[in-house]
Amino acid sequence: MLWAGYLMIKKLLIISIVLFSIGLSAQPSDTSIGGARDIYDGSLYPDKAVRTYSRTERIFPTRVIKAGSKVSPLLQSSQQLTSLKFISEGKTYDLPDYVALNRMVGLLVLKDGKIAYEHYDFGVTPNTRWMSMSVAKSFVSTLVGAAVKDGYVSSLNDPVTKYLPQLSGSAYEGVSVRDLLMMASGVKWNETYTDPSSDRRKLLELQIASNKQGAIFDVMKTLSKASEPGKNFNYSTGETVLIGELVQAATKMPLADYLSKKIWIPVGMQANGLWWLDSPEGHEVGGSGILAVLRDFGRFGQFIINGAKVNGQSIVPDGWLADAGSAKPIAGVTGKNGYGYQWWTVKPEAGKIHESVFMGRGIHGQYLYINPANNIVIVGLGARPKPVGKQAIDDLDFLAAVVETLKAN
């Protein structure tokens, strides 16, 4: 009798455990994401931020940046970055500190075109397509160079209205292609990401509505003039969107297709990319929104450091990269950076190790760091809580330490 009772209890216990396990496994994983306004407000909690930043194609319509059948291999370097100690603002940090505190979901370091360090975190994998944010601006700059080399754009001194007559009679009358590339149009613009009334957020609202191809002109034509063109720097995502519209008008080709033709396929990217659109089947948002895997961002950086060459021939004019990656003598660029043609430069006071460096940078911690003098490319994919200003550790201090370490090995 006691034995039968024991067996019954044991059986019930096993059934309970099995049912409990089934119940646990049946719980759906949380795949919810935030919206575009949440990204720019900086209102997402950490896990949801990662889910959102890795799935923005669920927020905006996109066009595929097609990869080819031939993938360019990235081999392992004999110089491996196995450990790192560095000082930032008087405190000592290591690699895990930087990843954790600056919320880096992906880091890739290429030395002489080979992988010296690669790390993924917060659930991100080598196959995750992550948002570039404004790093896309540096891609667009390179496409302008390609359009000049291909003869679609005659000169950077051409007026913008030659290619975009929609801007005739606006504050962009008399602004050159070069002025746009330098963010020095002289047109008034407020880039504040967290201010719903800013020009940047007005642009975002058009993108959220996704109901009109080329809607950017509805905002840009209404802007007023603040200064003469070519004199003062004023960061404007709207102007890079205009540059994208200009390239598309000149080439008569969607930006994603031109990027695929000139870079994605010939460079040997491993995966298709995506590019945000202003409307379904509409125009690419030139100022942001390229989605790619970490290694493909790295391949683009190495392509730039190698002179933007395909089969030994550069896709941009002679001297383009040196010009694009050098600071322009215009007022208004503050902090440790200068600005070229949609590329950030680094001022000497940030450290001699950054001499000749140029960078693509995007909100929430995205960057593409190119150090030609040491043949080093570093890609950082971030999931920081706020669009700007919330990194715990100065990225430039970390980047300098990586370069110094690899130089010493």
Where are these regions (language model features)?
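Structured C-terminal helix/loop/strand segments within mature extracytoplasmic catalytic/sensor domains
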Residues: 27-40, 360-409
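Active-site helix/loop module of the DD-peptidase/beta-lactamase fold
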Residues: 131, 150-188, 222, 249-287, ...
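N-terminal leader/targeting segments and the immediately adjacent pre-domain N-terminus
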Residues: 24-125, 153, 182, 219-221, ...
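Active-site SXXK
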Residues: 113, 130-156, 180, 243-247, ...
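Active-site-proximal loop and beta-strand segments within enzyme catalytic domains
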Residues: 84, 92-98, 114, 124-127, ...
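Catalytic-site signature segments of enzymes, centered on catalytic residues
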Residues: 126-127, 192-194, 201-280, 288
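Active-site-proximal alpha-helical segments within enzyme catalytic domains
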Residues: 183, 239-246, 286-309, 366-382
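Active-site Gly/Thr loop motif
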Residues: 269-274, 325-377
